[in-house]
Amino acid sequence: AMLLTHAQTALAGSEESRFKKPLKTITRDAGYPAAPAFSKSPYSDIITKYAKSYGVPVDLAHAVVRVESNFNPKARGSAGEVGLMQIKPATARAMGYRGKTKGLYDPETNIRYGMKYLSKAHELGGGETCGTILRYNAGHGAKRMNPISKRYCGKVIAMIGN
């Protein structure tokens, strides 16, 4: 058996308390910016305007744009998704867009139609975050969570906290 001196026991105790304290400050959004960081986006006014106009929670709207494009209006996805909200041209047309694909790179146009789609996803998801993300990411008709949408929802929850 190992015998510890009083000094070693005291040291072990102080080591333990030293490591316990920082853990209390770590939150599940570690590694993601807090919601106020969204206000630094050059598109936050447009995002907020359309989120409010379509009844989408503003923090959710900002989180979706961040996950989709990291606020890059020139982003292009591998399946033809375009712009800030990575909307497919066919999806934008289903939401009433009548222009050319390149018009969807315009931040306001992209957010207008992307937010309209997100609003419907939010409604279909019953206002629940992961239900909304599933339907935005996998299509309005999606019913079962998939690994990609689950990861996406995890990122959004880490950013907005619910």
What residue ranges belong to the model's regions?
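Catalytic and substrate-binding regions of cell-wall glycan-acting enzymes that process beta-1,4-linked
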Residues: 132-162
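N-terminal propeptides/low-complexity segments immediately following signal peptides
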Residues: 10-31
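C-terminal segment of classical bacterial N-terminal signal peptides
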Residues: 2-10
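Solvent-exposed loop/turn segments at secondary-structure junctions
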Residues: 69-72, 91-94, 139-143
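A short, structured beta-strand-centered segment in the mid-to-C-terminal lobe
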Residues: 102-109
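Solvent-exposed, polar/charged alpha-helical surfaces in well-ordered, non-transmembrane soluble domains
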Residues: 45-52, 62, 93, 112-119, ...
